[in-house]
């Protein structure tokens, strides 16, 4: 049985294997470790324990364990002769009966930064293909004349998806000159001739590459274009051929009257009625230009999902999950150079390099640490690990959410994919 273990001082791959009844090779493989490197105090690993034995970790509760393993809380308590209010102790051994997994859908976004695409990124895409329902190629950019600017090597990426029975998504953005453009969007939404040409080009492109989901990631849409955007989506929906789906990206909102040009044009209720599913960007509370904090703290993410559920069926909701973290220089000041984006693997490597422990914020459900670099500058790092990912999986179960959407491929959390299939059955539609 897979469980998450937090590294303590003196732990090694060999000592953990012995303690939990696993093997060093399995721990190395499941966590993407370099056997020559030491573990970091506070690092979260997944370990395959013997049988159905579970060893209580910091922050655990019976409820959390029952969620993680898809076992009714009362059943877990009863089989271990515990009350529902029993206090657990770190290291305590529990027996966890086999649970029942539910099916969800999953998306991962691919955003190449080079032409041609780096082979390492292509290989990373192939490696996670078995865990995906959809592969989202970011992005086809809308143009003012109703045509599309295609990303590089589209056919190659679409073929990788279909070979793994994954549906390639045609992701269309309103990006112009590197930024999301309200003006560009207005042209498409308000000119019927251009709009119809635009939809025709989209459908022809989707057919050409076998992309059976049409996905609009229109951001920074002018508030006055809210109803025009809804009408546009209805227009696309009526023209979709049989066997195709329509989806959109939504910014994270907690109310229908949330103010700000970033939020107002995204109509959760209308889009929930029109499209087949939505991807909600439940991340970037901690962002490159803001103060250091968790990128997707569990509390705010839950608030967004609860609001979304009040506007649409939960099975239509794909919760956004960041695969990246950020490294901020301190002290933070507005106007500082942006924080550096890093992967989970890179974050742990930094903690190892500077010999600092990784801490875990149980309120935010996110790992973090501080270090001083060679120039004496202090840094603060927030990232994702197996604990924070598992907390999001538990939230999906609690809220009955239809799936998860990862941004983006190439920023590895090695444990994520094993945990995903331990928690859920991934729907394949290809």
Regions found by a protein language model. Name each.
Residues 1-20, 43-70, 94:
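Primarily a LysM-type cell-wall glycan-binding module
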Residues 120-143, 201-214, 392-404:
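Catalytic domains of carbohydrate-active enzymes, especially glycoside hydrolases
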Residues 144-152, 226-352:
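Substrate-binding surface in catalytic domains of secreted glycosidases
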Residues 106-110, 133-137, 168-172, 214-216, ...:
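Hydrophobic faces of well-ordered beta-strands that scaffold small-molecule active sites
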Residues 392-430:
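Acidic/aromatic/glycine-rich contiguous surface patches that form carbohydrate-binding/processing clefts
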Residues 171-180, 184-185, 323-392, 421-430:
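Glycan-binding loop/region signatures in secreted carbohydrate-active enzymes
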Residues 99-198:
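Glycan-recognition patch characteristic of GH18 chitinases/ENGases
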Residues 197-228, 277-291:
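Active-site groove signature of glycoside hydrolases
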